Design a protein with these regions (language model features):
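Active-site mouth loops of central-metabolism enzymes
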Residues: 17-33, 79-81, 131-157, 202, ...
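Glycine-rich phosphate-binding active-site loops on the catalytic face of alpha/beta enzymes
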Residues: 49-55, 91, 95-106, 174-179, ...
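N-terminal amphipathic alpha-helix/helix-capping segment at the start of soluble metabolic enzymes
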Residues: 1-23, 113-127, 133
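Glycine/Thr-rich beta-alpha phosphate-binding loop at enzyme active sites
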Residues: 142-188, 230-237
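Hydrophobic faces of well-ordered beta-strands that scaffold small-molecule active sites
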Residues: 19-23, 48-50, 75-77, 92-94, ...
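Active-site beta->alpha loop and helix N-cap motifs at the rims of alpha/beta catalytic domains
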Residues: 23, 27-37, 47-52, 70, ...
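Alpha-helix-loop-beta-strand connector modules within alpha/beta enzyme cores
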Residues: 60-83, 113-120, 125, 182-208, ...
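Conserved anion-binding
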Residues: 84-165
Length: 248
């Protein structure tokens, strides 16, 4: 297994920006996964996240093994529930939904996951997950039955992120949601980045190289691209190479 967290810390210390591609298992075609992974390997991606809000875990082992046969990038689980855990991945973002007050996503699912995790060698990276209002209801809202935080209340979001860090989370993830109409505000990214000392991940609603660069410049250490790549696997072509990931 490859440990990602030390690499993420090293990248943050060296101001090296990271890009993760989020793959929804419900939408993956195993027959065409080779072509998809080839696109990822040619992109600026440094990590692959696998998971979705409603996926029930069927064939997840097969999906991860197929990915690992075709890429050397670290593969981290991004689980919506404990059924989305497999020992075949390299690690897991062990999520705590800090923006909501549904006990299932604050602690219950984490407790349920313990017997499964104890049987694996997964690198477990505790992650404070904060859903931000994005202009429309997202799958995360529907599944978790929680409301996102106000996209204009930068100080409260920054306080929430800091609380997540003080609780012990190793990463903070600001999420606008899959297919979000609006990305996380740049001023909010800046406010959170200035308040916390752990690495900051930002995802949802980012649809262009400009959007990625703006998030980096605002303080994101890792940007997650999901729907944009899902809708267009040529998203990065003729646009970026791995050597062009910015160092603001």
């Amino acid at each position: 297994m490859r440990n990602s967290y030390p690499q993420i810390l090293e990248a943050k210390a060296g101001n090296q920006k990271l890009v993760a591609i989020l793959l929804d298992p419900d939408k993956l075609d195993l027959a065409g996964i080779g072509v998809l992974v080839a696109k990822i390997n040619e992109s600026p991606a440094t990590h692959i996240l696998v998971g979705g809000s409603s996926f029930e875990g069927s064939h997840l082992d097969e999906i991860i093994l197929s990915l690992k046969q075709k890429t050397t990038l670290p593969i981290l689980l991004f689980p919506g529930n404990p059924s989305q855990i497999t020992a075949e991945a390299d690690g897991i973002l062990f999520l705590q939904l800090l923006s909501g007050r549904n006990p299932d996503y604050l602690i219950e699912h984490q407790i349920d996951a313990v017997p499964v995790l104890e049987k694996t060698n997964l690198e477990i990276i505790s992650t404070g997950y904060i859903l931000i209002e994005s202009g429309s209801e997202t799958a995360v809202e529907r599944v978790t039955k929680t409301k996102p935080l106000d996209r204009n209340n930068f100080d409260y979001v920054a306080q929430t992120a800091k609380a997540g860090e003080l609780i012990g989370n190793k990463l903070i993830y600001l999420e606008a949601g899959s297919g979000a109409q609006q990305a996380v505000p740049l001023a909010m990214i800046k406010a959170v980045a200035e308040r916390i000392s752990v690495p900051l991940i930002v995802g949802g609603g980012i649809r262009s190289k400009t959007g990625i660069n703006e998030a980096f410049n605002a303080g994101a250490d890792m940007v997650v691209i999901g729907t944009a790549f899902e809708n267009d696997s040529a998203f990065f072509e003729n646009d970026w190479s791995k050597s062009q990931i910015p160092n603001p």
